């Protein structure tokens, strides 16, 4: 028994490779999605079996027991193809198979646009969740296979919510088929449109600032009258939290958003949730987010812990202000992730005491660090060393 896993691209016969065409014409049985089977020419066998899941396909192959069976897939067999689910089952049954390529939707769209695609970030949103904001923040165009709940309009809605409404996007519908349509517009305009089920989305790279190490100058932020965590302290916070590019992070009591911005720059493929209830502070966070293009920074208006309930589980949490609810905030974070890394800043001894009590009550390994930073300031013809207020960083689960 020989099984061929053949990729058909858009399904149009004249775009198939000669090898795929030959296997289809020689096949005794062809299996696959109904749409692909319907597109096959009359010269191909009439023994066509509609099946989509790997288990359905394997059962049909075993039942038919024919010498030459062909399983057809849309797009390319190596590009988010269902073939990858069937191959392990065939190998387990010791059934010989051949994998044949086809045109992927990324190749089709690139050719129609007259653009190279080797630098595109390729993302599947076909029946699975994805983060379009993180995707467009990688410094290159992001191509999305869409389907199910995540159609182009839904993906663009997420971009708009992140402040990327003006980002140029292109939607390709029914590529290489009679109903083909290509539309270029902004993400905001895309939200109001409806597209065919067979659609793909190409989003251009989001504007991003030059990359640099943590510790942005204090003068770079819009500050207003809201207290701001200083440069060297922010650097220490990021070191304590050991932020990775894909992390989900909370900044509770975000203030101006200076820590939120630093976290978002470090977690460029992740997500940062800045929790703050003061209107003036929320406005400053918005301004700083736009200034630094940290589109993966999401504002959560409200008080903690109430505002934390709907947030995804964090990898690390910074608590810069608790509003007297330290114990409840720590508990909320631990309920989402028992191994979450915690860093709490404090200038008052009472806050240190509350943080230690909350962590010790739960048996969390704890470290207290005091930072006392002094900087030179000119006074007449002299440079005097002036001390900033000492600050404590109380950390939990940060020893590994």
Regions found by a protein language model. Name each.
Residues 265-272, 336-338:
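Conserved S-adenosyl-L-methionine
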Residues 246-255:
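Conserved class I S-adenosyl-L-methionine
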